[in-house]
Regions:
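Noncatalytic, typically N-terminal accessory segments of nucleic acid-processing enzymes
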Residues: 1-217
Length: 217
């Protein structure tokens, strides 16, 4: 639930002179890297969607491919593109407030109705329909079996030091989907606490990937 075009407006505003509009692999200094993770999961699915559609994969196989693609994207972002020196904070969306749950339910009911309507039209006019074996919206939601698998896969990668950069002092913190609140709310709370504790002399640089704004810039 992002504010449309907000991030694009901020980085295009001359007032925010300290905001980098582009990051080259390993060439932009970064101390803290915050990842609102749900958007990365969606991107991972899109990356392998064609392969899934061309092959008769089982549900378990699809989920395995999505999980491994998520880990590959995460490793590239942390170890090659951003290379944070101090902390990487990965946050999954947890249970939403009741008001948002109601809104999400309404939106998903509408999406199902539209999908059924489009299916009827395609059948009527004999248009080939691509198979949607794995419903990403239903699976990439707090409390699902897939999100539990994702949490376990991230924890495994952390134990295996998959996300370790050349800086051995860099720590990876993972906040899973069992904690209430959206990913950005979780790390913004941590950011506020860090700002209170930090010295004014310290030059800290933060990089934030937000799920609702990833495709905007």
């Amino acid at each position: 639930m992002g504010v449309p075009t907000l991030f694009k407006k901020i980085i295009s505003n001359k007032f925010y002179k300290n905001i980098h509009k582009g990051i080259r692999d390993g060439q932009t200094k970064c101390n803290y890297f915050f990842m609102d993770y749900n958007g990365i999961v969606y991107n991972a699915y899109e990356n392998i969607k064609k392969d899934i559609e061309e092959n008769n994969y089982s549900k378990d196989k699809i989920e395995h491919l999505v999980l491994e693609e998520v880990i590959n994207i995460t490793k590239k972002l942390i170890c090659t593109v951003i290379q944070p020196s101090k902390i990487t904070y990965i946050a999954l969306d947890g249970p939403a407030p009741r008001a948002k749950m109601v809104q999400q339910r309404s939106r998903r009911y509408k999406a199902v109705m539209e999908k059924d309507f489009m299916k009827e039209l395609k059948n009527k006019f004999k248009i080939n329909e691509s198979k949607d074996i794995w419903d990403r919206s239903a699976n990439i939601s707090p409390g699902t079996e897939f999100m539990e698998k994702l949490s376990n896969r991230i924890i495994k990668a952390m134990k295996e030091k998959t996300f370790q950069t050349h800086n051995k002092n860099m720590k990876v913190i993972f906040n899973n989907g069992n904690t209430p609140g959206e990913g950005e709310h979780k790390f913004l709370g941590l950011l506020r606490d860090m700002r209170k504790m930090e010295s004014k002399k310290d030059d800290k640089i933060y990089v934030i990937i937000n799920s609702s704004q990833m495709g905007e810039t």
